[in-house]
């Protein structure tokens, strides 16, 4: 049992580690994006990230932009497994907030050439705090109730769990933009991505409330299992010794005798007969049944009892191991590089068309394992966690009015990226089995200049994920999204601009149905049927909502 549970727990923790893998490229890299998400054809300083080829349209001199975002993310999984606390609608909330989400851009423009640098959280920053713990773990511990109910009358459980993941994936981008002619500009560069992730937490104080032979108060499950395991071991040894004694009587020719006949024949004393009868009564046999038994049958009962108690002693050892306190403290680090190409077209003075292609970033993270009492993160082991290649397109139009209209597309090549995902057997999973299509985002927005100093903006972005139901899990899920952003820009001086933005992101609720097999075998009374319990049909419902506040300062040295 312990091997199976160890494999299950290890897979759950590895899956938790993959919560930051895949579908994680961030596009909210500036306050300008937060206030108007269609930035792919921007000709501003945040074009370092969104439209680097368009930097040739900047005025000569140094251009800088410093941004920060405050990200508030609320995630929740609802699970209807009947033994979970809170069933049939057990809620598992998780907070993923970031008070620091910085972005810095710098560009030096001289005539037809611009040199640029960008520093951004490309693959995620902040932490996810599982306030109730990991739901997949709690399902395991809730299975203590059906496992121990028949023999011990257990009706409830409790567990203290706390897990927190943090992720910091910073990108350092360098590149050169050059104007080929007044219409066409090109960009070539690359981005170094450095990643650090941590997984810390623990499981403590797993309690159950046995009522059969106990007072129904909650007590530590590991202590309970240790005590009953020792009792089962002692009983197994006693019945094994008794079976050996009965075998000697059978060998002496008393196999077809009853206990009364064995005593009358002088094979055993009245006290020994009482011990044999007491041992059979403890197995649930009535006096009439005991009186009718032949010694061959008594031997069978004793052997079966010895096997039964030995098996339950092993089961209790597994429960003791499962319900002991555990801690986890792991850090993963790694780095990767991706080339970036860009193109900008200025058409008919009013139209801008931009194209950018980012190659996939190959990321291999190494475990630095300080504490791992789950056996999931071997120290020094490596795991892949790539960032997918991305193609972005943008179009903007600025007519004679004070409005600029923009639209954009981001297309992620998820199916060809190596996210390091594995199945329950620890084998690599092909993306085609869990990702039906590449994900994409469509955006549209507008900016309106009230006067020479103040600009207002708003926009919308639709995010479509391409994952299949098999990708979704209690820990890692990807959902379609709707983003609305608004804000403005204020020119403090001709060379200093303040950007302020706010975005609300709503995700489409999704769900998954699957069979849950009881993780802990049932302890049954002696002689009961040991048929395997049918799996329970379980439904998970995933939901999420985000809010982003952003502020940025743009500065020009002419």
Label every model-predicted segment:
Residues 87-92, 157-162, 324-330, 376-382, ...:
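Extracellular loop and loop/strand-boundary signature of outer-membrane beta-barrel proteins
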Residues 64-72, 117-121, 188-192, 355-359, ...:
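Transmembrane beta-barrel strands of outer-membrane/channel proteins
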Residues 56, 107-110, 174, 178, ...:
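Residue-level signature of outer-membrane beta-barrel architecture
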Residues 488, 492, 543-558:
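Outer-membrane beta-barrel "beta-signal"
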Residues 71-75, 120-126, 193-197, 358-364, ...:
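Structural signature of outer-membrane beta-barrel domains
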Residues 17-126, 477, 503:
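N-terminal, post-signal peptide beta-strand-biased segments of exported outer-membrane/organellar beta-barrel
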Residues 46, 97-102, 168-172, 335-339, ...:
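Residues that define the transmembrane beta-barrel architecture of outer-membrane proteins
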Residues 62, 112-115, 183-186, 350-353, ...:
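Repeated loop/turn-to-beta-strand initiation elements of outer-membrane beta-barrel proteins
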């Amino acid at each position: 049992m312990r091997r199976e549970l160890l494999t299950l727990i290890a897979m759950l923790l590895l899956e938790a580690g993959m919560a930051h893998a895949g579908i994680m490229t961030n596009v909210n890299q500036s306050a300008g994006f937060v206030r108007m998400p269609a930035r792919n054809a921007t000709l501003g300083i945040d074009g370092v990230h969104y439209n680097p080829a368009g930097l040739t349209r900047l005025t000569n001199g140094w251009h800088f932009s410093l941004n920060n975002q405050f990200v508030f993310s609320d995630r929740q999984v609802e699970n209807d497994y009947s033994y979970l606390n809170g069933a049939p609608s057990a809620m598992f909330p998780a907070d993923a907030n970031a008070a620091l989400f910085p972005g810095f851009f710098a560009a030096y423009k001289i005539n037809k050439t611009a040199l640029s640098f960008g520093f951004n959280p490309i693959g995620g920053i902040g932490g996810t705090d599982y306030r109730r713990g990991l739901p997949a773990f709690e399902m395991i511990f809730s299975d203590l109730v059906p496992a121990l109910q028949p023999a011990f009358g257990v009706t409830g459980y409790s567990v203290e769990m706390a897990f927190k993941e943090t992720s910091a994936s910073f990108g350092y981008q360098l590149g050169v933009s050059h104007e080929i002619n007044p219409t066409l500009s090109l960009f070539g560069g690359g981005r170094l991505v450095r990643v650090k992730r941590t997984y810390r937490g623990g499981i403590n104080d797993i309690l159950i409330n046995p009522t059969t032979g106990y007072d129904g108060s909650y007590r530590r499950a590991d202590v309970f299992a240790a005590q009953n395991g020792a009792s089962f071991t002692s009983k197994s040894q006693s019945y094994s010794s008794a079976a050996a004694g009965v075998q000697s009587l059978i060998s002496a020719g008393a196999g077809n005798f009853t206990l009364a006949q064995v005593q009358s024949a002088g094979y055993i004393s009245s006290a020994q007969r009482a011990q044999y009868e007491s041992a059979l009564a403890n197995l649930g046999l009535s006096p009439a049944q005991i009186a009718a038994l032949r010694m061959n049958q008594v031997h069978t009962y004793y052997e079966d009892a010895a096997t039964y108690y030995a098996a339950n002693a092993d089961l209790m050892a597994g429960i003791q191991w499962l319900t002991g306190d555990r801690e986890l403290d792991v850090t993963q680090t790694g780095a990767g590089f991706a080339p970036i190409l860009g193109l900008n077209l200025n058409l008919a003075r009013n139209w801008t068309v931009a194209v950018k292609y980012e190659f996939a970033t190959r990321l291999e993270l190494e475990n630095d394992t300080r504490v791992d009492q789950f056996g999931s993160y071997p120290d020094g082991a490596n795991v892949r966690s790539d960032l997918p290649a991305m193609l972005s397109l943008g179009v903007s139009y600025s007519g004679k009015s004070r409005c600029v209209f923009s639209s954009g597309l981001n297309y992620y090549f998820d199916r060809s990226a190596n996210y390091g995902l594995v199945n329950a057997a620890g084998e690599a999973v092909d993306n085609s089995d869990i990702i039906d299509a590449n994900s994409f985002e469509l955006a549209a927005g507008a900016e309106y200049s009230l006067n020479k100093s103040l600009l207002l903006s708003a926009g919308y972005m639709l995010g479509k994920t391409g994952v299949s139901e098999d990708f979704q899990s209690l820990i890692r899920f990807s959902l379609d999204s709707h983003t609305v952003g608004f804000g403005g820009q204020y020119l403090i001086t001709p060379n200093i601009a303040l950007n302020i933005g706010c975005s609300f992101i709503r995700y489409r609720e999704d769900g998954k149905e699957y069979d849950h097999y009881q993780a802990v075998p049932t302890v049954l009374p002696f002689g009961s049927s040991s048929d395997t319990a049918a799996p329970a049909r379980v439904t998970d419902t995933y939901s999420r909502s985000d809010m982003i506040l952003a502020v940025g300062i743009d500065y020009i040295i002419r």
